[in-house]
From Swiss-Prot:
Pfam families tied to this protein: Synaptonemal_3 (PF15191)
Gene name of the record: Syce3
Function, in words: Major component of the transverse central element of synaptonemal complexes (SCS), formed between homologous chromosomes during meiotic prophase. Required for the assembly of the central element of the synaptonemal complex during meiosis, via remodeling of SYCP1 lattice structures and promoting recruitment of SYCE2-TEX12 and SYCE1-SIX60S1 complexes. Required for chromosome loading of the central element-specific SCS proteins, and for initiating synapsis between homologous chromosomes. Chromosome loading appears to require SYCP1. Required for fertility and normal testis development.
Name this polypeptide is given: Synaptonemal complex central element protein 3
Species of the source: Mus musculus (Mouse)
Key words of the record: Cell cycle, Cell division, Chromosome, Coiled coil, Meiosis, Nucleus
Biological process, per Gene Ontology: apoptotic process; cell division; ectopic germ cell programmed cell death; positive regulation of apoptotic process; positive regulation of developmental process; positive regulation of reproductive process; reciprocal meiotic recombination; spermatogenesis
Disruption phenotype: Mutant mice are characterized by infertility in both sexes as well as complete disruption of synapsis initiation resulting in meiotic arrest. Initiation of meiotic recombination appears normal, but its progression is severely impaired resulting in complete absence of Mlh1 foci.
GO terms under cellular component: central element; chromosome; nucleoplasm; nucleus
Tissue expression notes: Expression is restricted to spermatocytes and is absent in spermatogonia, spermatids and spermatogonia (at protein level). Expressed in adult testis and embryonic ovary. Expressed in the convoluted seminiferous tubules in spermatogonia and spermatocytes.
Localization per record: Nucleus; Chromosome
Expression induction: Up-regulated in cryptorchid testes.
Length: 88
């Protein structure tokens, strides 16, 4: 059985390269769409916060409460681990 000629291999390589390029471009387009959606939501959030200043303050208080709660939970978790190690 004879090997395929160099022109045919070159053509097959070109088709594979074009197919790979097409897949890469599709992935890039999908990523750009995701970034575009994120930017749109960021712009929307900025408009909402500027038109409703109390929302920004509420978000800050909520974040502070969350961080305080998280800190307390971590402290309690460390205490529990310390007690468990002492008992063993």
């Amino acid at each position: 059985m004879a090997d395929s000629d160099p022109g045919e291999r070159s053509y097959d390589n070109m088709l594979k390269m074009l197919s790979d390029l097409n897949k890469d471009l599709e992935k890039l387009l999908e990523e750009m769409e995701k970034i575009s959606v994120q930017a749109t939501w960021m712009a929307y959030d900025m408009v909402v916060m500027r038109t409703n200043p109390t929302l920004a303050e509420s978000m800050r208080r909520l974040e502070d409460a969350f961080l305080n709660c998280k800190e307390e939970m971590e402290k309690n978790w460390q205490e529990l681990l310390t007690e468990t190690k002492r008992k063993q």
